[in-house]
Amino acid sequence: MNLIGIDNNSGEKVSEEIDLIMRSSDGTLVFVEVRRRSSASHGGAAASVSAVKQRRIVFAARHYLMRLREPPACRFDVVTVEPSGIEWLQGAFDAT
């Protein structure tokens, strides 16, 4: 995958809601939410991506896609960072 944009709090933001925008080898645009938790006491990192957060990410992605002449297929992934390790959840949610 190739990195297209990152929200690193230094300079111009890609989006207020989207942490990473990447393009996979098949051309799919991947919007990535990164979540970190020090413990699973409240359901873990993946559980922290609520329905409200998902809607905000989808809204921001649609706004980003409007800037493109020919928007490609896209998907929404979540990367979780926990004491037990890092997990990449591809297609974690969809835009519906």
List the predicted regions and their residue ranges.
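Active-site metal-binding core of divalent-cation-utilizing nuclease and nuclease-like domains
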Residues: 1-31, 96
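Residue-level recognition of specific faces of alpha-helices
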Residues: 20, 45-48, 75-78
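Residue-level signal for pocket-adjacent positions within structured domains
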Residues: 37-40, 44, 84, 88
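Short, charged, amphipathic alpha-helix that recurs within catalytic cores of restriction-modification
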Residues: 45-68, 72
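Domain-level recognition of nuclease-like catalytic cores that cleave nucleotide substrates
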Residues: 66-96
